[in-house]
UniProtKB/Swiss-Prot annotation:
Name of the molecule in the record: Elongation factor Ts
Gene that encodes the chain: tsf
Functional description taken from the UniProt entry: Associates with the EF-Tu.GDP complex and induces the exchange of GDP to GTP. It remains bound to the aminoacyl-tRNA.EF-Tu.GTP complex up to the GTP hydrolysis stage on the ribosome.
CDD domains: UBA_EF-Ts
UniProt entry tagged with the keyword ATP-binding: no
Gene3D superfamilies (UniProt xref): 1.10.286.20, DNA helicase RuvA subunit, C-terminal domain (1.10.8.10), Elongation factor Ts, dimerisation domain (3.30.479.20)
InterPro entries: EF-Ts_dimer_sf (IPR036402), Transl_elong_EFTs/EF1B (IPR001816), Transl_elong_EFTs/EF1B_dimer (IPR014039), Transl_elong_Ts_CS (IPR018101), UBA-like_sf (IPR009060)
UniProt keyword Cytoplasm present: yes
Species, as recorded: Lactobacillus johnsonii (strain CNCM I-12250 / La1 / NCC 533)
């Protein structure tokens, strides 16, 4: 039987990230053959990963990496936020994101076949991480953005990597691109322009907003406040010429009823029309970045800010860890009872 030296154990640990006892056991099992020991640990890791496959991994980090005219963004999940601050986990996120930016895979299957810096495939790296870290570790998603030489990337991560953003801007400097990435991190838009919002989505969001108004009106009724009206429209897509013309006529009728002199109507109507548009584009303001008030200067929208700069937002990606994942609700008392059996 081959002698298992401390140097052999150290080398195997460096190659696989395994613990001391696991590395020593692997070498004993394969009589000191380093390559076989690596494969032994990988097989063992795949078995561990399979056992953890059904677990919910909703914590983790985003990764952002810019490589010349290519930028990558990733979301890597773990089961607990404790693990997401682990040095090995952070290193895996950064290296996987860099590998994806350089390899430009077309889909997840292609991404998993990319070779990491140590020669291991990206997919195997996550299997190995699951085995060595002890939690389900998974690359949930990634996106790539490319730009031309005269465009700028903005890259930003917020709250220690819980949110990651990439922007692509035309006609802007790097600082503007980053500031817009910061805005997107904070305001969580879904699309660039209201034109991209689906009609059914607008209708659904109007229903959500009107439900909130109903809840507010219940509170207002308790203090004898006038109820707020329901929103009829939510997007500029819905504000046709006929809708705007009717709104203008309604404003004129209101001014007439109030006894305002007709000669001053032209000074009043534009402001009231803008208020009508603002009130009836709430879905745009929540979900379309160009319609949102710019967080660096809320006196203007992002669209107005970019127009002043002579810039155009070409694309963006925003990832937030765990969004859309239904997290398991832990019952601590039940867990303790189970352990006491």
């Amino acid at each position: 039987m081959a002698k298992i030296t401390a140097q052999l154990v150290k080398e195997l640990r460096e190659r696989t990230g395994a613990g001391v006892m696991d590395a020593k056991k692997a070498l004993v099992e394969v009589d000191g053959d380093m390559d076989k020991a690596v494969q032994y640990l990988r097989d063992k890791g795949m078995a561990k990963a399979a056992k953890k496959a059904d677990r919910v991994a909703a914590e983790g980090l985003t990764g952002v990496y810019v490589d010349g005219n290519v930028a990558a963004i990733t979301e890597v999940n773990s089961e607990t936020d404790f693990v997401s601050s682990n040095d090995k986990f952070v290193k895996l996120v950064n290296e996987a994101t860099k590998t994806i930016a350089e390899g430009k895979p077309a889909d997840m299957e292609a991404a998993e076949e990319l070779k990491m810096a140590d020669g291991t495939t990206l997919g195997q790296s996550f299997v190995d991480a699951t085995a060595t870290i002890g939690e389900k570790i998974v690359l949930r998603r990634f996106a790539l953005e490319e730009k031309t030489d005269d465009q700028e990337f903005g890259a930003y991560q917020h709250n220690g990597g819980q949110i990651g953003v990439i922007t692509v801007l035309e006609g802007a400097d790097a600082a503007t691109a980053k500031h817009l990435a910061m805005h997107i991190a904070a305001m969580s838009p879904k699309v660039i322009s209201p034109d991209e919002l689906d009609d059914e989505f607008i209708t659904d969001q109007l229903a959500v907003m009107n439900h909130k108004i109903d809840q507010d009106n219940e509170s207002r009724a308790l203090v004898n406040k006038k109820p707020l009206p329901h929103l009829v429209y939510g997007s500029e897509k819905q504000l046709s010429d006929d809708v705007l013309a009717k709104a203008k006529e309604d404003i004129k009728a209101e001014l007439k009823e109030e006894g305002k002199p007709e000669k001053i109507w032209d000074k009043i109507i534009p402001g009231k029309m803008q208020r009508f548009i603002d009130d009836n584009t709430q879905v745009d303001k929540q979900f379309a970045v160009l319609s949102q008030n710019y967080i660096m200067d809320d006196s203007k929208t992002v669209g107005e800010f970019l127009k002043e700069k002579g810039a155009k937002l070409v694309a963006f990606q925003r990832y937030e860890v765990g969004e859309g994942i239904e997290k398991k609700q832990e019952d601590f008392a039940a867990e303790v009872r189970e352990q006491m059996k």
